């Protein structure tokens, strides 16, 4: 796979996960607060959905943050730009698409159980995706790339620190 394909894969996976999660949360909030249709589960069912959704959200968030903490230093230590990019693309794809699935599942639990707490947990998961979004400079720092490697990847889109000092 070519280097540009890895960067496109990183952007596409992150955008799909982030915008899908944001759309799911917004649609759930609209359905939950604006829609005239309601589900009325029993109190027992509602409580179990709240517990299951909360446990799922907390486990998914903690595992995602743990994976970010453990994987990024390992990727930085690896040799070769191709290896770093392929590992990072796989890491971003699994992180964002897994969190998209978790957010959608939490939103389904929110609609079926009518629990506002689950909607807030879905918003926290989406906020985590926003904060972990891989832009050009974040990729440089997380993978430990040099300015030459970044210019070979992004061309004119990348502005090195030395370029700003000259102007």
Language-model region placement:
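Short, Lys/Arg-rich, polar N-terminal cytosolic tail immediately upstream
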Residues: 1-7
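Select subsegments of transmembrane alpha-helices in polytopic membrane proteins
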Residues: 14-24, 90-99
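Membrane-interface helix termini and inter-helical loops of multi-pass transporters
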Residues: 34-44
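Membrane-helix interface/capping segments
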Residues: 64-84
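Cytosolic juxtamembrane regulatory segments of multi-pass membrane proteins
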Residues: 87-95, 151-167
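Alpha-helical transmembrane segments and their membrane-interface junctions
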Residues: 99-121
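Alpha-helical transmembrane segments and their immediate juxtamembrane interface regions
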Residues: 123-159
């Amino acid at each position: 796979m070519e280097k540009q394909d890895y960067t496109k894969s990183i952007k596409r996976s992150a955008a799909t996960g982030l915008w899908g999660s944001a759309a799911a949360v917004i649609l759930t909030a609209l359905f939950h607060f604006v829609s005239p249709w309601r589900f009325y589960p029993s109190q027992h069912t509602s409580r179990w959905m709240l517990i299951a959704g909360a446990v799922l959200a907390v486990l998914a968030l903690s595992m995602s943050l743990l994976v970010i903490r453990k994987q990024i230093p390992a990727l930085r230590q690896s040799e070769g730009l191709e290896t770093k990019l392929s590992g990072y693309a796989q890491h971003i794809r699994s992180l964002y698409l897994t969190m998209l699935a978790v957010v959608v599942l939490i939103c389904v639990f929110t609609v079926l159980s009518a629990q506002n707490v689950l909607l807030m947990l879905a918003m926290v998961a989406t906020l985590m995706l926003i904060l972990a979004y891989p832009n050009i400079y974040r990729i440089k720092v997380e993978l430990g790339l040099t300015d030459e490697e970044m210019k070979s990847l992004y061309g004119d889109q990348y502005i090195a620190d030395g370029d700003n000092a000259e102007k």
